[in-house]
Amino acid sequence: MNMFDRPKIDGHCHVLDPVRFPYPAEVPYHPQGQEIGTADYYTHVMDAYGTRHALLVGPNSGYGLDNRCLLDAIAQGGNRFKGIAVVRADISKQALKDLQTQGIVGIAFNTSFHGLDYYADIDPLLAHLRELDMWAQFQVSANQLEALWPRIQRIGVKTMIDHCGRPNLADGPNAPGLQALWKLADSGLGVIKISGFGKFSETGFPFDDTHEHVMKVWSGFGPDRCIWASDWPHLRGTYRLDYGTLLKLTERWFAPAQLQSMMWDTPAKILGW
C-alpha cells in the first residue's frame, strides 16, 4: 500500500489561528510564519496524506492555558479530532468533565518547556484524571521522567509520553530518564508517541542517530502501546520538516504490519475511533 494512501491517525499535532484566536499577551512565545497552522489548512494536509483522524495538542507556545482554538477545531471537525488540553493545576473535576464532553481526552504537562518545579502541585489533578479515565500526557526531556515516575506510579494515572521520551542520547542507555521510561513501559500504565525525532537528534534529518532508541521504544512498549505522530507544524523548529518526508522516513524504519499498528489499530483503540 502506498504510504500516503494508508489510513492513519496522527497522534500529536497543533493548530494555531492567531487571526481568529489571538495569542494571549502573557504567553512569552508567539509562533509566526510557517509555524502557524490553522485547523482548516491542517484538514487539507490530512486529506493529502490519508490521515483520517488526529489528536490535537494544546500548544504551550502561543496559547498556554487558552484552549479556545483547540476546542473550536474539535467542534468544527466532526469526528476527525480529539484533544489534549492545557489547564491550571487547580482545575476542578467538574471542569475536566466539561472538557471531556467537548472532545478532550487528556491534559498536557510539558516539563521540557516549563521545568519540573512548575508542576509541583499536580497530584490532585493527576488523581482527577485517573478517576475520569483521562490521559496525563507528559513531554519530558533528558532525565526529567526520573522525578515524575514515582508520582505516576503512586497515583496510577494512565500516561502518554511525547516524542519517544526525548532522551539526551549522549547520556547513553543507562541514563536515569531512560530507566524510568522502561519502568513505565513495564508497568502497563504508559503509551508512547513515535514522533519528534528532531527534538532529540544530534545530527538532524534523517535522524539516523535516533534510530536505535526508536527501535528500543518500539520493543519496550510494544505495538499495542506505540502511536505514530507528526508533531505538525513543528513549533520552534530550526529547520524545515515536511509531513511527507516524515511519513517516508517512518516507512523505511518499520514493516507494514508495524505501520498498521502504530498508525491505525493502536491509536484507534486508545483514543476511541
Give residue spans per PLM region:
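Mid-to-C-terminal alpha-helical segments outside catalytic/metal-binding sites
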Residues: 1-9, 32-53, 215-216, 221-227, ...
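Hydrophobic faces of well-ordered beta-strands that scaffold small-molecule active sites
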Residues: 9-13, 54-58, 81-85, 107-109, ...
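Conserved, mostly hydrophobic/aromatic
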Residues: 12, 46, 70, 99, ...
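Generic structural signal for well-ordered alpha-helices
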Residues: 39-43, 67, 71-74, 93-97, ...
